[in-house]
Amino acid sequence: MQMDERKKKILRAIVQDYISTAEPVGSRTIARKFDLGISPATIRNEMSDMEELGLIEQPHTSAGRIPSDAGYRYYVDCLLEKSSIADDVKDVIEKETTKRIAEIQTVIAHSSKLLSELTHLTSIVIGPDKGKSAFNQMHFLPYEPGKAIMVVVKENGVVENQIVEIGENVTAEELQRIANVFNHKMRGHSMEEVKRDMLHEIYSELTRQRFLIDNALELLSAVLSNSPEESSKVYLGGTLNMLNQPEFRDVEKIRNLFQIFEEGAQIIKVLHPQKEGLAVTIGGENKLKELRDCSIITGTYWIDGEPLGTIGLIGPTRMDYGKAMAMVDYMTRTLTELLTVRRRN
């Protein structure tokens, strides 16, 4: 059985009406709301065929039909028309992200909050994997006698601050020279590469400050390590938006969902960086059973061709896919542009 143009129009109408009302859709509703030029009886027959195809299904308590996961998938892949974002919404996104760009963690966290507010869905933004990034640059700030603040910027844009013992009588000029040597030798390299290939050169150029160099390298090793606690940070926004969805009025269902939200590591497992475009995972396609009533839309934000993190929206399978996909796409492109400009400056 093929999906001809008439069936496609009816399926599109069912999905759009169900997204809007959260109520099962009947043939008379379609005939009344959508100008398809066909009778309720004909619509009923076509709906029967689509039920056999597994694209729609009948809830136990209703005579109407709702889209199945397969129906949503067909809609997203074959019927969905590309949505655009209003200029005033674009202005809000650009303004709110630009004014917080000084600190990468801040802009990422705020992007999550902003995305949930604009869509009324649950947003998720995965920050840079702190453990995977190489060294970019560092500098020292005076702190107190015998100590300085070592500011380290990783290649992924994450900034780390550490207090380092520098010893007595170390001048600001000497600290600057040490930072210059580290920046020149280590930029773009992991700590493993530094230890393997560069320690001799660093010590040769900085023979007078062995105590400070040892302390700085020890702290750098911790900052650039691949330890579990240095993994990607998950920023969730609008988790309470799920409580407003009719699908999640069941207490047990929402409890299980919120437990997944609290366990960031579980969320990371189901979100994978995309080389390009968006990923849409619908209902039963999700690996976690707690997310089987949800759809997830994700995109990847980048810096100079390097994937930095993931942005996504989680909502009921009955979400407005066009709007949600447009928002995720625009947010990923905005973050990519802002973070790339920030890095180059």
Swiss-Prot record:
For this UniProt record, the keywords arranged alphabetically read as follows:
Repressor, Stress response, Transcription, Transcription regulation
Highest taxon of the lineage: Bacteria
Q: Which InterPro entries does this entry report, sorted A to Z? A: GAF-like_dom_sf, HrcA, HrcA_C, WH-like_DNA-bd_sf, WH_DNA-bd_sf, WHTH_HrcA_DNA-bd, WHTH_transcript_rep_HrcA_IDD
The alphabetized list of GO BP terms reads: negative regulation of DNA-templated transcription
Q: Name one Pfam family in it.
A: HrcA_DNA-bdg
Q: Which GO terms describe its molecular function?
A: DNA binding
As for family, the record states:
Belongs to the HrcA family.
Explain the purpose of this protein.
Negative regulator of class I heat shock genes (grpE-dnaK-dnaJ and groELS operons). Prevents heat-shock induction of these operons.
Q: Which HAMAP family match?
A: HrcA (MF_00081)
State the protein's name.
Heat-inducible transcription repressor HrcA
* Species assigned in the record: Desulfitobacterium hafniense (strain DSM 10664 / DCB-2)
